[in-house]
C-alpha cells in the first residue's frame, strides 16, 4: 500500500533578531559570523508562544490546506527537543485543538532535530498497514542556545505539520521510500533540568552531521537505484546555511536543486522543524511530477532520508494556507534586550 503527504502546514513567529544585534552584545564580528554561518537573522517566539502553540498553529494550517476532517486523524505525533512539559504530552494538546480527539493515539517524539521526520516514518507505518486512516506528524521547536554560545546566532522558533495518508487520490506527494542511518554519537546533548544544550563544537560536523546525512542519503539512493540528477529538488537539515550547501555538493546535488528549500538564512535553525520547513517551502513551489529528495539530521545521531514525487493534487491545495515565504514576510525586529525577555534569559535571583 502506497503512502504519501495528504496535506502540510507551517508556522513561524513574526519576531526576528538580526545576527548583528546578537554579535554587538558579545563583541563578535557580525560580518564574519554571517558569512560563516550563512544566516542573517532568526525567528523569535512571542512571550506566550512555545512548542505546543507553534505545533497547534502548524497543525491547523495542515487541516485547512486540504480541508481535512480532523476526526479521520488516528495518530498525532509531535517531535521536538523543547516540549513545554517533561510529563504531559504536547501531542494531546494539538489533537484537542484541532478536534481530533478522542479516538486516536498520540505521543511525543524526541531525537534532537529529526524527531519530526521520525514521527513521519511512524505515521507511514500506521497508515501503510491500515491501522489508521490519517496520521499527523509535527516537527516544532523553540530552540535553545546559551547566552554567548555559537548556537545563539541560529537557534530559532517554528514548526511544520504533515498529514500522512494512504489514498492516492488525496496525496499531494507520494512518499516513494525512506531510509535511516543511526549511531550512538554524542555530538549534542541536554540533560534533564539543564536550561541549555551542550555540544561538541566542530565535532558536530564530520562525525555528526556529514556522516549521518551522507549515510542516509546514499543509503536511500542505493536502495532505490536513483541518483541526484533524478530529482528536481533537494532538502537537507539546516543548522546553518553552510552545512546543507556543503553536503549537497558532496552528494552531487546542485545549488539550484537546494535553493527553493534553503530558508535558514532568514529563519534560523528551527531544530525539529528545520528539514521539514525546507520540504514545505519546496512543496510551495513544486510542480506535478517533480521529485524531491530530503534528508533530516538529528544529533545523537541519525539521518532520515525521503524520496517524494509531487502529484497533480498540489495545485488544488497549495494556496489554501499560508506558504513558508508568506510567513517570512513582514517581520518585526527586536533588539537583544527584548529578545532576552522573549526567550526567558532574564532570571531573577
From Swiss-Prot:
GO molecular function list: acetyl-CoA C-acetyltransferase activity; hydroxymethylglutaryl-CoA synthase activity
Binding site for (3S)-3-hydroxy-3-methylglutaryl-CoA: 29-30, 113, 154, 204, 237, 246, 269, 299
Pfam family, one: ACP_syn_III_C
InterPro entries found in the cross-reference section: ACP_syn_III_C (IPR013747), HMG_CoA_Synthase (IPR004656), Thiolase-like (IPR016039)
Record-listed E.C. numbers: 2.3.3.10
Positions of transmembrane segments: none
Pathway(s) the chain acts in: Metabolic intermediate biosynthesis; (R)-mevalonate biosynthesis; (R)-mevalonate from acetyl-CoA: step 2/3
Reactions accelerated catalytically: acetoacetyl-CoA + acetyl-CoA + H2O = (3S)-3-hydroxy-3-methylglutaryl-CoA + CoA + H(+)
CDD domains in the cross-refs: init_cond_enzymes (cd00827)
Active site: 81, 113, 237
PANTHER family: 3-HYDROXY-3-METHYLGLUTARYL COENZYME A SYNTHASE, HYDROXYMETHYLGLUTARYL-COA SYNTHASE
Role, per record: Catalyzes the condensation of acetyl-CoA with acetoacetyl-CoA to form 3-hydroxy-3-methylglutaryl-CoA (HMG-CoA). Functions in the mevalonate (MVA) pathway leading to isopentenyl diphosphate (IPP), a key precursor for the biosynthesis of isoprenoid compounds that are building blocks of archaeal membrane lipids.
The protein's assembly and partners: Interacts with acetoacetyl-CoA thiolase that catalyzes the precedent step in the pathway and with a DUF35 protein. The acetoacetyl-CoA thiolase/HMG-CoA synthase complex channels the intermediate via a fused CoA-binding site, which allows for efficient coupling of the endergonic thiolase reaction with the exergonic HMGCS reaction.
Protein name: Hydroxymethylglutaryl-CoA synthase
Lineage: Archaea, Methanobacteriati, Methanobacteriota, Stenosarchaea group, Methanomicrobia
